[in-house]
Amino acid sequence: MLNNGSSTPLYIQLKQIITDDIKKGVYSPTAKLPTENELCTKYNVSRITVRKAILDLVEEGYLIRQQGKGTFVKSPKLKRELIAVNGYSEFMESTGKKPKHHVLSHDIIPASKPIAEKLQIQPESPVVELKRILYNDDQPLTFEVTHYPLDLFPGIDTFIADGVSMHDILKQQYKVVPTHNTKLLNVVYAQQEESKYLDCDIGDALFEIDKTAFTSNDQPIYCSLFLMHTNRVTFTINSPYT
């Protein structure tokens, strides 16, 4: 409990209690904190004290506030090698976490000109458009839109399901293994659709990654657009000294 007789300000004492609870797992990543009023009652302090402690913890990266929803424990940022070839499922397994993805939709559509150019196919050729949300624990990490050429992967839409690795489908069903890719990285701002799927505010900064994957003979096999909240991932680049 808080010590009113201590020379340490009450808000700092409260900060320490909350950070200790986070480290001990009392509040797990993405967990919602009690409301300001509930914390006031629990620790017998003013709302100003609670608010100061919460704001400091937000600035220090322990918590995140979502307008109209409350205050949540922030998941540690994932570190992702920008030029990595492995897919989401392989990456999550390499960190000791279980992959979790949710399929929003998958449809057969005619390829637009930009998609056709990336996949080196004719415009209007049939492609499967897959939209998914990829998670880190229970927090949305990535909103993904991927296109697969149907002529190269006939029937691929029948294998798509929640929890299924698309790289595994390519390897097991079509004997195709991506060996390298190109990526374009930009920063954009969340619109209504991204805000909904990534559980963030409209206007939040997002990483936008435009990726095309290739086989060893440079044949494009899919192209993806990934949107990721900048607070949830850090990208690294390992390169030889030149």
Curated annotation (Swiss-Prot):
DNA-binding region in chain numbering: 36-55
Keyword entries, A-Z: DNA-binding, Transcription, Transcription regulation
GO molecular function per UniProt: DNA binding; DNA-binding transcription factor activity
GO BP, one annotated term: negative regulation of DNA-templated transcription
Xref: Gene3D superfamilies: Chorismate lyase-like, Winged helix-like DNA-binding domain superfamily/Winged helix DNA-binding domain
InterPro entries listed in its UniProt record: Bact_HTH_transcr_reg, Chorismate_lyase_/UTRA_dom_sf, Tscrpt_reg_HTH_GntR, UTRA, WH-like_DNA-bd_sf, WH_DNA-bd_sf
Pfam annotation, one family: GntR
UniProt cross-references to PROSITE patterns, sorted A to Z: HTH_GNTR
Domain (HTH gntR-type) ranges: 8-76
Protein name: Uncharacterized HTH-type transcriptional regulator YurK
Source species of the chain: Bacillus subtilis (strain 168)
